[in-house]
């Protein structure tokens, strides 16, 4: 087992990708490692000969088909949606399946500069020998254009407008000019860009209309029902636990259902049976947070408990997930405990008591 804390998609699922490449008989777009059909199988699950391909995305298959079809054309892809809807996860796996490399990535922030998108210089070499290819520091976009592969741009709306504007010419002209060297580097076939942006947390600046026109936009929804969300959570928690030393068994169906029920009710503003309205806290309570909560509960159970995730283990995680704005969220959580959870019956009694004890501290 690798000692790396987190493997890339192509490393984690290397055997699946090898099996798909071996069995793939469909035509491949130039620069692609797999055909569009094989990419779809990798993302949504299926078979590659005798090898089972686990689904990386559980949801509307048609959305994935649209994503793949977009990347076949010369259009860039923009994945948007609520936080925790697997935008980054999907972009990484699309890049891994199509190019065999998901490591060409720019993390957007208020500090991202145009040089990080185009190129910069090794200033020691620049001062000693002037502009040269050896002194040129290529950005992930430059490397992707040069090799004809996918590049990922995370949280594009967190970048300043002038940085976003630099993308417009790159996506329109599909080339990078380096006037200091008198070269004009065109993108090789196979190049495309996959960007992500949150709809809830819009970041520093919204995208301009000109930049939006350079993308095909796909909105990734939250899981449509509790069973779908439980399936996603169970699969991802299982994958994470296989490389984390939690010393705990996977959380049982009863525990997972409780966590997802609470998250969905608070997130949607009503109980699952639609009979009672509830107030929503300031936090997102996304599927990704549920996965993190359950993984942390496994660590608690393995290190300080019986080795099996209990109501007491998830209670601490629930309070931390719900209460972000101390006063307002604490009141919302208290009302939910007393008006909803308390009335759910004896199966929920232990969790209710554990949550109330923590709320008093």
Where are these regions (language model features)?
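AAA+ P-loop NTPase catalytic core and its hallmark functional loops
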Residues: 2-245
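Intrinsic-disorder-associated interaction segments
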Residues: 6-10, 248, 252-255, 259, ...
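Non-catalytic, well-ordered alpha-helical scaffold segments
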Residues: 61, 65, 139, 165, ...
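Amphipathic alpha-helical interaction segments
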Residues: 74, 101, 128, 218, ...
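Short acidic/histidine-centered micro-motifs embedded in hydrophobic/aromatic stretches
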Residues: 170, 262, 316-317
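A general alpha-helix detector
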Residues: 214, 232, 296-300, 317
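Conserved AAA+ ATPase small/helical "lid" subdomain
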Residues: 237-309
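C-terminal engagement/docking regions of AAA+ P-loop ATPases
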Residues: 302-361
């Amino acid at each position: 087992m690798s000692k790396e804390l987190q493997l890339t998609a192509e490393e984690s699922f290397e055997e699946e990708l090898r099996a798909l490449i071996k069995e793939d008989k469909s035509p491949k777009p130039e620069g692609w490692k797999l055909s569009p059909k094989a990419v779809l199988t990798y993302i949504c699950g299926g078979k590659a000969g005798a090898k089972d391909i686990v689904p990386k995305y559980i949801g509307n298959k048609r959305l994935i088909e649209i994503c793949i079809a977009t990347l076949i054309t010369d259009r860039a892809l923009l994945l948007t949606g609520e936080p925790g809807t697997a935008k980054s996860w999907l972009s990484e796996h699309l890049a891994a399946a199509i190019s065999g490399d998901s490591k060409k990535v720019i993390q957007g922030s208020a500090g991202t500069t145009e040089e990080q998108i185009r190129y910069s210089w090794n200033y020691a070499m620049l001062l000693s020998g002037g502009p040269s290819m050896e002194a040129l520091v290529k950005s992930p976009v430059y490397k992707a254009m040069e090799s004809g592969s996918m590049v990922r741009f995370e949280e594009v709306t967190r970048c300043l407008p002038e940085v976003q504007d630099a993308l417009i010419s790159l996506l329109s002209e599909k080339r990078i000019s380096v006037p200091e060297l008198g070269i004009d580097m065109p993108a090789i076939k196979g190049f495309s860009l996959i960007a992500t942006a949150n709809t809830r947390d819009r970041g520093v600046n919204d995208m301009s209309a000109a930049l939006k026109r350079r993308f095909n936009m796909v909105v990734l929804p939250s899981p449509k029902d509790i069973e779908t969300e439980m399936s996603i959570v169970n699969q991802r928690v299982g994958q994470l636990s296989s490389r984390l030393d939690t010393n705990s068994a996977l959380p049982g169906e009863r525990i997972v259902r409780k966590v997802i029920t609470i998250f969905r009710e608070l997130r949607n503003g009503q109980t699952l049976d639609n009979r009672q309205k509830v107030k929503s806290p300031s936090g997102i309570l996304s599927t990704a947070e549920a996965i993190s909560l359950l993984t942390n509960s496994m660590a608690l159970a393995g290190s300080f408990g019986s080795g099996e995730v209990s109501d007491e283990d998830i209670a601490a995680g629930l309070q931390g997930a719900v209460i972000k704005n101390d006063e307002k969220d604490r009141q919302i959580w208290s009302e939910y405990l007393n008006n909803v959870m308390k009335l759910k019956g004896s199966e929920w009694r232990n969790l209710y008591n554990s949550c109330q004890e923590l709320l008093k501290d």
